């Protein structure tokens, strides 16, 4: 589906799968958990106020903060982001446009380069077995993952950190090759080990 908002704000996270059959067209805008085709939504936006280059817009290029917000509300909600860079009269991308994009990339890399859970102890209430243990979430291996038992839809996963940390962003990924299976989650924390917030 196309996120048809020029503001590029995706208001929800949808399944990225659909049924590849004409009679299921209504699932195009939300996705279908039992879908058999991987079709993520596409969020299109221009780095400038319009889709084509106008010199008078050189001072109105989206700020790095605006681009970060767009990234979080598109890619962060399971959508592909198509960011338009209109070439100027020389056929080149304007230096302000490319600088803001480079700074966005730097911010993304800095935000997600450090796994704050590295060194944490992890346990789960529902584990399929040693091959799918919760420690697999922290091993940095793309071919390993945590899984709960078949037929059980809930698992509490608890990370115990060696020290208190502060963060303002969280990335949770699932093994998309197995389909979009996570439908609901929540994050809670405790400082004293007793009271969860």
Describe each model-derived feature in a short phrase.
Residues 149-155, 164-165, 176-197:
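Trp- and acidic/polar-enriched beta-sheet ligand-binding modules for extracellular glycan
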Residues 170-171, 187:
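An aromatic-rich alpha-helical recognition segment common to small helix-rich domains
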Residues 1, 5-6, 10-151, 159, ...:
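Mature catalytic domains of secreted/periplasmic carbohydrate-active enzymes
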């Amino acid at each position: 589906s196309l996120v048809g908002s020029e503001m590029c704000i995706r208001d929800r996270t949808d399944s990225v799968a659909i049924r590849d059959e004409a009679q299921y067209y209504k699932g195009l805008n939300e996705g279908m958990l039992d879908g058999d085709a991987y079709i993520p939504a596409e969020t299109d936006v221009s780095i400038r106020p319009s889709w084509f280059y106008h010199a008078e817009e050189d001072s109105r290029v989206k700020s790095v903060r605006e681009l970060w917000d767009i990234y979080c509300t598109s890619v962060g909600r399971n959508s592909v982001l198509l960011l338009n860079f209109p070439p100027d009269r020389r056929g080149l991308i304007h230096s302000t446009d490319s600088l803001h994009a480079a700074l966005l990339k730097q911010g993304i890399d800095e935000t997600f380069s450090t796994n704050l859970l590295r060194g944490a102890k992890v346990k789960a209430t529902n584990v399929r077995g040693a091959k799918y243990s919760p420690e697999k979430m922290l091993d940095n291996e793309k071919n390993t993952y945590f899984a709960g038992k078949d037929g059980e839809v809930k698992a509490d996963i608890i990370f115990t950190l060696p020290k208190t940390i502060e963060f303002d962003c969280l990335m949770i990924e699932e093994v998309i090759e197995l389909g979009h299976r996570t439908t609901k989650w929540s994050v809670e924390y405790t400082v004293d080990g007793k009271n969860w917030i």
